[in-house]
Structures are given as C-alpha cells and as structure tokens.
Amino acid sequence: MRRFGEITETWNPVIGCLHLCVYCWARRLAARLASMRVQPYAKRDFAPTLVPWRLDKRFSKRSFVFVCDMGDLFGDWVPREWILKVLENVSRNRSTSFLFLTKNPKRYAEFDFGDNVVLGATVETNRFLQGISRAPQPPDRLEAMASLDHEYKALVIEPILDFDLNEFVYWIRRIQPIFVVIGYDNYGNRLPEPSLEKTRELVDAVSEFTEVRCRTLREAWYER
C-alpha cells in the first residue's frame, strides 16, 4: 500500500475554471499573474486552457504532485482529450504519486487511474449551497465520491462551511477517504462557516476512522 504524505509540488498542464466560487484564490492569483505578463495567464487569464509545454514534465520518484491547483481538470467544460494527455504523463511516472482535486467528481468514472493516484473532491459542507458556487452541489459530490471505485480517495473540506455533523460524518465514513483536509477560509470572505467548536467536533469524529490533516482552524468570523 502506498503512503501519501504532504504535497511536494504542483503541476498545471491545464488551467482555468468556470465554477466561479466566490472565495476562489486561484482566480485572483491568475489575474495578478496576467497583470505581470506571465504566460499563459497574460493571454488567457483564468479561461480553461491546455498548456502544451507543461504536459511532459518529469517528476522525482518520491514526489506527491498536486495536479491542476490552478483550475478544475474534471470540470464538464474540459475536453476529454486534454484529460487523457495529462493521464498519459501520470501513467509514465508510476513511481510518482499524484493528487487530483475537483468539484465535479462524477467525471472520475469516465477514466482509468493507477494506484499512484489519489482522487480527491472539495466538499465544503454536506448541505445545498446558494450564491457560493456554480459547481455541482455538495450532496451530489459526496454521492459521486461514495460511488467511486478507487483504492485511494481524499476529501478537502476547505473552506469549511456550516454543516450537519452526523450526516456529514456519515458520508465521509461511507466514502472511506485515506485522508481528509479540514480548514477555514483564509481570505476574509465572511462565508457561512461553522463555529470553531463545531469544527473541532467534526475533526474528532472523522479522526476516529481516518487521517485528518488540519489547515487553518480558527474562530468563525462572527465569533471574534
């Protein structure tokens, strides 16, 4: 069984996203890079884009690579051919580990993945959301991850939004992730987030059956 530690590097052969999440740091970073004339952002900003010169990147055997942290590779708008090009390099680097992360995990079922891949989903809450994102609703993401037949799965609950403790824990347990990342918004967006006490209850409950990797844990903005 593979061991997956902390991310050691990122790889962005495809950039851009159309989910329009209100808290998206990557979209703001892309705009800043575009203003500095950094390619491909200077030409494309945050529009979905294949970056051909990044496709054949080589990786060390011990790396754990976060694929496409500047976009959603599995968004419905991404051509299948782009994804296959990315997976070709993943399959060539069997000794390197890769993390995919999406808000559209139902699309994972369209592709084959090796045991050097962790399939992740960002799921901020178990509840339906309004005015936060155009991504598939969190309950749909949870269902897709629970149905996914892959040995290594992960969940990212960041930025965490208010949730129903028992139901959320039920879904996380059903998904059987090898690790769960939990953290608050870092950019002052005043999201509908849970109290720190409630988040700690979630951390404790999930820690009983899988690894929890805590990021920013703080009082909710309305508790300060």
Regions found by a protein language model. Give the residues of each.
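N-terminal [4Fe-4S]-dependent radical SAM core
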Residues: 1-66, 72
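Small/flexible residues
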Residues: 4-5, 34, 39, 46, ...
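Conserved AdoMet/S-adenosylmethionine-binding subsite of the radical SAM
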Residues: 46-210
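C-terminal accessory extensions appended to soluble enzyme cores
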Residues: 210-224
